[in-house]
A protein has these predicted regions:
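Short acidic-hydrophobic, aromatic-tinged amphipathic segments that line or gate anion-handling sites
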Residues: 207-215
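Glycine-rich phosphate-binding loop signature in dinucleotide/nucleotide-binding domains
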Residues: 3-6, 102-105, 159-165, 223-224
């Protein structure tokens, strides 16, 4: 879906694979709990391909549905101990966030990552001053996950927005579906879990697929290129 950028008041960003790379810590946490449960961890690349839906969905694929609940319990307990390991901000992220805010456009995180971990990571990476709101999961009043329509409606309502006044930038088909379920414009960066070909397949076009945030900011928003 193309966007009328003159109407955009807020840009929502996915977190993992879009703003930050936290995959090494996620893998370490998974591998640690898998070994605790007597399992042989699958490879880093296998894990990376499963991230995006929810931790329950990810662990169901990695350790099986029968063990997923126990795995989630262990993962949630262990992740705060390792979540800052090897985490970094992806290229162009600070640049695009600053440019959006200078243009008067609000920025928000819209993620399936748990809310507390999302806030802690944004604080640790010093991105919080560039973010107006954070929407994460595992909160009492927010039981949904992308791409459930209710979650997309929830973030729009909290930001007092209609879908045409917002845009979602992500890195996976979950993000595309989450935006489309409410008619929100969506763009993707190929810096996370899916290659450009997979993103083009799920969107049906390469028009809104970009290699990184620098390319997206320049080509879509016409920001001055980073030197």
């Amino acid at each position: 879906m193309s966007a009328d950028l003159s109407k955009i008041q807020t840009v929502f960003f996915d977190l993992d694979g879009t703003l930050i790379d936290n995959f090494r810590a996620i893998y370490k946490c998974y591998a640690d709990i898998a070994r605790e449960m007597g399992l042989v961890p699958k490879s880093y690349h296998v894990l990376r391909a499963t991230v995006g839906g929810s931790i329950t969905m990810t662990l169901s694929k990695l350790i099986g549905e029968d063990l997923a609940d126990e795995g989630v319990r262990r993962f949630r307990a262990h992740f705060p101990e390792v979540m800052f390991e090897d985490v970094f901000v992806l290229e162009g992220v600070e640049w695009i966030l600053k440019n959006l805010r200078e243009r008067g456009i609000r920025t928000a995180v819209f993620t399936n990552k748990e809310h507390a971990s999302s806030v802690a990571l944004l604080d640790y990476l010093k991105l919080s001053p560039l973010i107006d709101a954070v929407f994460g999961t595992n909160l009492p009043d927010m039981p949904w996950r992308k791409p459930q329509r209710e979650y997309s409606e929830y973030v729009l309502e909290k930001m007092n927005l209609s879908a045409e006044n917002a845009m979602l930038i992500g890195d996976s088909p979950f993000d595309v579906s989450a935006a489309r379920t409410v008619g929100m414009p969506v763009a993707c960066v190929a810096t996370g879990t899916h290659l450009p070909e997979a993103l083009i397949e799920c969107t049906g076009s390469q028009e809104m697929i970009f290699p990184n945030m620098f390319a997206l900011g320049h080509d879509l928003f016409k920001f001055i290129p980073h030197n």
